[in-house]
Amino acid sequence: MTSTPDLNRRSFLGATLGGAAALPALAQSQRDFSGHNPVRYPDSDIVVLDKKFAKYKINNTAIHRLHTGMQWAEGPAWCGSGHYLVWSDIPNDRHMRWLEEDGHVSVLRSNAGNTNGNTFDWEGRQLSCEHNTGRVVRYEHNGKTTVLADKWQGKQLNAPNDIVVHPDGGIWFTDPGYGILGFYEGHVEPLRMKEAVYRIDGKTGQLAMVTDELFKPNGLCFSPDYKMLYVCDTGHTHYPQAANIIKVWDVVDGRTLRNSRQAVSMDLAGKGSGLADGLRADKDGNLWVGAGWVGPGYDGVHIFTPAGERIGMILLPEICANLCFGGSKGNRLFMTASQSLYTVYVETQGAHIT
């Protein structure tokens, strides 16, 4: 596989996937997210495609925009101990924070290495994937920063992207290299190594590559029982032969992967095929997937059963890069979508701590 580092993923997508926006699409409301003209219940942009999804839709709630003004919002993660959401504004090189108590939004951290993905570990410490520095870091409670991973077999990592934790203390992350393919999200240089998924051992700190079979591994999450790992492949941004899919593996002893197979296709009959960027599992094993680059009636969140059946959609007016469950009851979905942060209550909870 030969990458094309002269094209960043935004310009490439505009040329390759943008044409899909002209395809027929599901009806999407022309709504006012300012709050001056509230939407009528039930919210028509929470779409039930199959009766299996009906129980997750709350008919007297609506999608809300919590904040706007970012350049490219990514990496939402819920801090249960602090009752706040953190997310990345990659081009502006900062971490943002939304407080559950009063909805206040502020810059949590500047000069964040063009961070993309974030999560929290079992001790409530923020873990972040830095595009520009090629590092995975942990922010300690005392304010110090610990570098958890920056090299594989002596070579600097490309640009870590998304990250999750395992109950055994292991930290899993993807490295598709986007952060060194353009100045907008990092800097420009050739890929240093093959795009891959890695695991940091929670006890020894040793880094291991667990798979490099995807074109560009992006968002990732575990099944509720941690026996399977799902990873989005956004390889079509730079490899035209790559399919827009999510793959799944069996997790062996919490350390290695086997039995690779396709879990989800992002094709939507009669509408187009966009990218699955980030994803999370709910407690029933359904996948909630940030999707986009097709247009109205597609962009937003797609919900799939564990068998890969698309049962629902949350339509947004912007491309949804990533999402997480949070809130005091774990039943609130937070969605980072292009320039904005959105949220909606759902009748389920996230499977994991963030």
Give each language-model segment a name.
Residues 2-20:
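N-terminal secretory signal peptides and thylakoid transit peptides that target proteins
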Residues 31-61, 353:
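Blade/loop signatures of beta-propeller domains
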Residues 94-96, 135-137, 196-198, 245-247, ...:
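A short loop-to-beta-strand structural motif that recurs across blades of beta-propeller domains
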Residues 326-354:
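Blade-level signature of beta-propeller repeat domains, shared across WD40, Kelch, NHL, RCC1
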